Amino acid sequence: MLSANAKVKVQNFGRFLSNMVMPNIGAFIAWGFITALFIPTGWLPNETLAKLVGPMITYLLPLLIGYSGGKLIAGERGAVVGAIATAGVIVGTDIPMFLGAMIAGPTGGWAIKRFDKWADGKIKSGFEMLVNNFSSGIIGMILAILFFWLIGPAVKALSTMLAAGVDILVKAHLLPLTSIFVEPAKILFLNNAINHGIFSPLGIQQSQEFGQSIFFLIEANPGPGLGVLLAYIIFGKGTAKQTAGGATIIHFFGGIHEIYFPYVLMNPRLLLAVIAGGVSGVFTLVLFNAGLVAPASPGSIIAVLLMTPQNAIVGVLASVAIAATVSFVIASFFLKIQKEENGHSLEKMQAASKAMKSGVQFNTPARYQGVQKIFVACDAGMGSSAMGASMLRKKVKEAGLAIEVTNCAINDLPEDAQLVITHQDLTLRAKKHTPNAMHFSLNNFLDAHFYDNLVQDLSNTKVADLAKVSTLEPQEAPQTAFVLTEKQVFLGLKAANKEEAIRFAGERLVESGFVLPSYVDAMFEREKMVSTYLGEGIAVPHGTIEAKDAVLKTGVVVCQYPEGVKFNEDEEDSIAKLVIGIAAKNNEHLQVVSAITNALDNEDAIRILSETDDVEKVLALLKA
């Protein structure tokens, strides 16, 4: 059995692969449709439009994967360097390089991230843009050349090895076991050497002698891929589940097997499903003594049936059906396990949070030795985490601890972070950025009991000289006070649902000149990730971190809903009476955030903010 730490690493690796592939699944679907329609054996053959097929699978798709991989490691700079490195992989070989892209992209991101860390603080003022551009260009060039020279020989060696393995099994009359080599080779686009070097010559010879050949269907059987896609349709989640239906049509009826490759690449355990499906399919063909009279191209069920002799129809259909069934069962098992693992992780986080609330210390005080800084992180580092950090900072100050408490976006967490607090739905993502930090999960950033217990543990550890009372404010403390005016306060509102409330807050931010109209859409995108309801009747809708370019200047609008607005359908007590729309350029809005968290200590203040019809009272409380 894998240890808990090993399981987390496997899960994180799987999520990383998925995050490289899934943003680009639309491009795979587009390529699949173009291929199925316009190639010579497609539904609408078109010589001109068919020219799109080769460049898209050779260049576009690997570049997109490399770009996404680099971006996951080091943002936009990592994406650019990752794409440059991937170009070296593409040119270094004559087959589509998905696997190479999944290596080159993150490598490019890692390289530029290491350089940026080394260069931090060493660049003279005024030379930042010059150094940034040239560093990414030079590092990208070096990696592209390196991958160009390395990838060709590596691919050739791997292809030769797979072909040799198949040849040994064929000569030993162990045909079903050839799928152990064939299915992984298909996923990596290394099947040409097997097809053209072994299966085609043997298939032609056997077909001339017996009128059919099993070798024509070992690689072309659509069953294994069909099983995986059906498993995603039923047990998948997110974009993978939503797109699997269209991919199934392209794969099974269009014969474009490449369309299911990304679904396996992002979850490598599914290789076992397609291998088992392939083995069972070939075994069925041997059992029924079935085969095709000629190669089926493309490998759709229609082309397969057209190449099937009358006496082999039952065997071929049984082969496809059994291969699909076996692949489906095994893929479903792995996808269900993945869901359960994620669910168990969430349950553990929730249990930990409840333990904190009840006063149970689930981390020994010794673990806090040396902690000097605490990060409260959320997706954008703007609203939710700012509130939590403000509340925790106040408690740390009252305890006399010399510990800095700051909020930030998860993507901005430093590698050397010691202690990180996130919403339970974002903890796994935070762990990817800072795997060596202590991570705490909560489901309410305004959970005072959580912070009380944490501060108590920190105090017991004596992490700092208690004689030195120092509450460190965020490094980017505002230079000028943020001004909240009566034009930014809206009282006595009503909304049928949270969407209305969020849109109202967003439109007021636009009207006040704080943001561009596109920021409103980003507020809805942020809400889809994790609810911005904080608890205590307060919600702080704001945009995603990608939407910061749409922020013209820092602004806050306070919207009061005396009758309340339900923010989480599955939580009865998630009724927000204060909906505070936030757009932050820097940290000027923290003044209002701090005032709100201070008001939480006073039940009368929260009641007044939620019910008063006097704007001046609201301003007085939030300016306190």
UniProtKB/Swiss-Prot annotation:
PANTHER family linked to this entry: MANNITOL PERMEASE IIC COMPONENT, PTS SYSTEM MANNITOL-SPECIFIC EIICBA COMPONENT
Transmembrane segments: 25-46, 51-71, 135-156, 166-186, 274-293, 314-335
Quaternary structure (record): Homodimer.
GO molecular function, one term: protein-N(PI)-phosphohistidine-mannitol phosphotransferase system transmembrane transporter activity
Taxonomic classification: Bacteria, Pseudomonadati, Pseudomonadota, Gammaproteobacteria, Pasteurellales
The UniProt record lists the keyword Cell inner membrane: yes
Free-text comment on this protein's domains from its UniProt entry: The EIIC type-2 domain forms the PTS system translocation channel and contains the specific substrate-binding site. The PTS EIIB type-2 domain is phosphorylated by phospho-EIIA on a cysteinyl residue. Then, it transfers the phosphoryl group to the sugar substrate concomitantly with the sugar uptake processed by the PTS EIIC type-2 domain.
Listed InterPro entries: PTrfase/Anion_transptr (IPR016152), PTS_EIIA_type-2_dom (IPR002178), PTS_EIIB-like_sf (IPR036095), PTS_EIIB_2 (IPR013011), PTS_EIIB_2/3 (IPR003501), PTS_EIIB_mannitol (IPR029503), PTS_EIIC (IPR003352), PTS_EIIC_2 (IPR013014)
Membrane topology type: Multi-pass membrane protein
Catalytic reaction annotation: D-mannitol(out) + N(pros)-phospho-L-histidyl-[protein] = D-mannitol 1-phosphate(in) + L-histidyl-[protein]
One Pfam family this sequence matches: PTS_EIIC
Enzyme Commission number(s) from the entry: 2.7.1.197
Name listed for the protein in its UniProt record: PTS system mannitol-specific EIICBA component
Modified residues (Phosphocysteine): 378
Domain PTS EIIB type-2: residue ranges: 372-463
